[in-house]
């Protein structure tokens, strides 16, 4: 019972097709149709531009519909969609949560989205990502994982979840990993 369609945007282009289920990283911001294989980066220095794109096979709403504990009302699911980011730093997991972003119709439709960890020239307004990097660095630093001059292999997994409707008690229903990527 919803005014939102079940159809999402599907696979948008060859880059999307080649990287379904992956998070890819870049040193500058790219639109979905501008990003190319040569745009991808594997290593970063903290403080330089760090951007990412999540490529999923279906929208977050479609990934969550039908899961135990999730409403069958597509609009309610779209309203409650949020993402977690699980970072594995040298094999040690740190769970973080993205702030909610996007309109309900976007959460229902989008199969790819972009984010930024560090944008040296922010002009795009609110873009997801910097909040999970801040949390990763703070928690990793306090756990003794990060030290000046140290190098780390970091894997990021993106996981959709559905929060309970406004005013309702309960924990979010957490879905499967929909995309994963590694960088150093």
Range-by-range predicted roles:
Residues 60-62, 93, 164:
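Residue-level signal for secondary-structure boundary sites
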Residues 92-143:
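Extended, solvent-exposed segments with strong compositional bias
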Residues 2-28:
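A eukaryote-biased signal for short, well-structured alpha-helical docking elements
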Residues 32-85:
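Contiguous beta-strand segments within globular domains
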Residues 79-86, 127-183:
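Internal, hydrophobic beta-strand segments that form the core of beta-sheet-rich folds
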Residues 20-27, 49-56, 80-86, 153-159:
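Ordered hydrophobic segments in well-structured contexts
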Residues 65-113, 155-160:
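Extended low-complexity, serine/threonine- and proline-enriched intrinsically disordered segments
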Residues 19, 93-95, 173, 177:
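Residue-level detector of beta-propeller blades
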């Amino acid at each position: 019972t919803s005014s939102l369609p079940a159809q999402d945007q599907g696979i948008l282009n060859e880059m999307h097709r080649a990287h379904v289920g992956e998070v890819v990283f870049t040193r500058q911001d790219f639109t979905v149709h501008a990003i190319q294989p040569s745009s991808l980066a594997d290593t970063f220095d903290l403080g330089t531009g760090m951007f990412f794109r999540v490529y999923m096979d279906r929208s977050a709403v479609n990934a969550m519909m039908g899961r135990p504990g999730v409403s069958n009302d597509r609009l309610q699911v779209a309203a409650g969609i949020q993402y977690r980011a699980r970072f594995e730093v040298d094999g040690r997991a740190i769970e973080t949560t993205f702030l909610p972003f996007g309109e309900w119709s976007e959460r229902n439709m989008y199969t790819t989205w972009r984010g930024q960890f560090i944008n040296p020239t922010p002009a795009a307004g609110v873009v997801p990502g910097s909040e999970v990097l801040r949390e990763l660095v703070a928690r990793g630093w306090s756990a003794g994982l990060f030290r000046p001059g140290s190098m780390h292999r970091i894997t990021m997994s993106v996981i959709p979840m559905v929060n309970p409707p406004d005013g309702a008690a309960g924990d979010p229903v957490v879905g499967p990993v929909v995309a994963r990527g590694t960088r150093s």
